[in-house]
Amino acid sequence: MSAILTDRQAEELHKAIIAYLGVINAPKTAAAFREEVNFSAAFDDATRKKYEGLLEKKWTSVVRLQKKVLELEQRNQSLQSELDSTTPTSLLRRNQDPSSWLPRAPARHTLQSHRSPITCVAFHPVFSSLASGSEDTTIKIWDWELGELERTVKGHTKGVLDVDFGGPRGGTLLASCSSDLTIKLWDPSDEYKNIRTLPGHDHSVSAIRFVPSGAAGSPSSGNLLVSASRDKTLRVWDVTTGYCVKTIRGHADWVRDVSPSFDGRWLLSAGNDQTARLWDASSGEAKCTFLGHEHVIECVTIAPPVSYANLASLAGLKKPPPLSSSAEFVATGSRDKTIKIWDGRGTLIKTLAGHDNWVRALIFHPGGKYLLSASDDKTIRCWDLTQEGRCVKVVTDAHSHFVSCMRWAPNVVKDAPTNGDAPNGTTANGASKKKDEESAKAGIRCVIATGCVDLNVRIFAS
């Protein structure tokens, strides 16, 4: 057993077996087992209660996973048969280009379990797991492909305001922040155990994002997390130590949202002072202030390089910025019901009007052609950057109440980028641009998750 299980795992298994033998009223067998495995640890009522039912749960989990694997194998076999019998011409006709896919009603899944409004959602970068946070103080982990609840994560004492997956390569973590003034880190590989709590903010922590690798000049790539708070500050944390390594001040009021650039060099924040601000993540110095909204700015996002060509055309530029550069364009959404697109120097490029209530979430389409927004008017709107930002699609009644959050499933990453590469499969030198564009399209996952005051999380997928 020692060759398969660690000492800790073996001890946990022994406790679960002893608890199970107690449940089925087999004290002699339990005593014999304890003697056989030389189990001398105390086993009081609290320990017994903790481990009762664990063995049965593990067993049913294995059966459930076996069933899921079987279903996936059958589905894969069916799809492969269909693919083998389909000609390339008809395949192109039947399958929509993922770079042009937009969400449509009805949702594939409506996920129900939260008891209070949903405030945030986040996709696991690899697995089909989705985290949702709520004012009910819990985080729910879902399988978004199957539409099933996997577990409920508890630990915060007030509403959960944001969640995000990220962290060091090969060691994905889930981060959450709350009105209880704390940030918590959870380990998905260990049943979402709370591995660290980060105190330090003096008011509600509104938003968190893992900072992509290589940020802030840190040699420990992927270890940084940025948070935004009602205490008017941004804080940068090292998740390996739990220490705050930088506090960024400049906003005059509640900071509602924060978004890092793809390379981690820049941080974009905004909030109740009706401004958005771009910061150098390494020095904490302000690069630019975006002025123009007439109400609180609820959400911000930095445009990915794949959208540069379309945004440069929208801005009237002769040629787009190099794909290796970051924070060239940004978008902001406000309670004034508008979305504004800016260049990285603070020049307003376009104002998108159409929502009838607060704009609560923004995401750039991974294909680079669209900007999507979610609003308290219950809709999702899709804006075409190649058509002067015209609204080309509205998902009406996406929810029955205010849509509070929206995230796009991250692209499937097949190969690590080489030096000079930007995300979404594009290269700085353009040597293999066509090949990279095809690879980027193939990696797009046409899946969006939204959360709402109506207590529902919805999955929109192709």
UniProtKB/Swiss-Prot annotation:
GO terms for molecular function: dynein complex binding; microtubule plus-end binding. One of its GO terms (biological process) is microtubule sliding. HAMAP family: lis1 (MF_03141). Positively regulates the activity of the minus-end directed microtubule motor protein dynein. May enhance dynein-mediated microtubule sliding by targeting dynein to the microtubule plus end. Required for nuclear migration during vegetative growth as well as development. Required for retrograde early endosome (EE) transport from the hyphal tip. Required for localization of dynein to the mitotic spindle poles. Recruits additional proteins to the dynein complex at SPBs. Dimerization mediated by the LisH domain may be required to activate dynein. WD repeats lie at residues 113-154, 156-196, 200-247, 250-289, 292-352, 354-393, 398-445, 447-462. It is found in: Cytoplasm, Cytoskeleton; Cytoplasm, Cytoskeleton, Spindle pole. Residues 60-87 form a coiled coil. Keywords: Cell cycle, Cell division, Coiled coil, Cytoplasm, Cytoskeleton, Microtubule, Mitosis, Repeat, Transport, WD repeat. It comes from Phaeosphaeria nodorum (strain SN15 / ATCC MYA-4574 / FGSC 10173). This is Nuclear distribution protein PAC1. SMART domains: WD40. Belongs to the WD repeat LIS1/nudF family. Self-associates. Interacts with NDL1 and dynein. InterPro entries: Dynein_regulator_LIS1, G-protein_beta_WD-40_rep, LIS1_N, LisH, PAC1-like_LisH-like_dom, WD40/YVTN_repeat-like_dom_sf, WD40_repeat_CS, WD40_repeat_dom_sf. Residues 78-99 have a biased composition (Polar residues). The gene is PAC1. Residues 78-103, 414-434 are annotated as: Disordered. Residues 9-41 form the LisH domain. One of its GO terms (cellular component) is cytoplasmic microtubule.
